[in-house]
């Protein structure tokens, strides 16, 4: 059963938090937050801008495309190892292509924790890195993409995206 939780952020209209609970025990199985966001293609380096725009018909191209940010996602330790996280991402993706969805949304984006297991999880679920390397992402975020620089510290997260149009064409 899906329930809304975390009312403080919801009251301020900043994000919505949801959790799935077992109806018989009220145990939280998993939880996630979503917020409106966008992929601002016009501010990206030309190779990335072209990569994303190439999938959009010319007449529909815009400086940015609507996205939903999955801000937090967690599975209870009691249910880990049962692919609940995979099912949760499938649920979120299907939610935003449902005809009854109240908003247009082209992408699901995440700031994945910079750890190989997290990258493998999101890649297994169809997510791709927006930037091809830590260095490229770090340079863009810290230097506005002007000149290549060497990262001072490792990235804590990496931006990944899933193009929802893929589910429409399956």
What are these regions (language model features)?
Residues 112:
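His/Cys-centered metal/cofactor-coordination and adjacent catalytic loops
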Residues 1-81, 86-109, 119, 123-170:
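Non-catalytic substrate-recognition and accessory regions of acyl/acetyltransferase enzymes
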């Amino acid at each position: 059963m899906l329930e809304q939780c975390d009312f403080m952020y919801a009251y301020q209209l900043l994000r919505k938090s949801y959790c799935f609970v077992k109806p018989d025990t009220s145990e939280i199985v998993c939880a996630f937050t979503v917020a409106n966001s966008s992929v601002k293609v016009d501010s990206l380096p030309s190779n990335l801008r072209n990569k994303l725009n190439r999938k959009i018909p010319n007449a529909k191209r815009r400086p940015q495309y609507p996205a939903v940010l999955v801000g937090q996602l967690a599975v209870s330790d009691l249910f880990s190892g049962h692919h609940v996280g995979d099912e949760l991402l499938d649920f979120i993706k299907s939610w935003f292509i449902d005809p009854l969805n109240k908003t247009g949304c082209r992408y699901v984006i995440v700031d994945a924790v910079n750890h190989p297991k997290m990258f493998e999880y999101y890649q297994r679920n169809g997510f791709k890195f927006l930037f091809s390397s830590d260095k490229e992402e770090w340079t863009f975020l810290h230097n506005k993409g002007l000149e290549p620089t060497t990262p001072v510290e490792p990235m804590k997260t990496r931006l990944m995206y899933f193009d929802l149009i893929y589910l429409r064409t399956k």
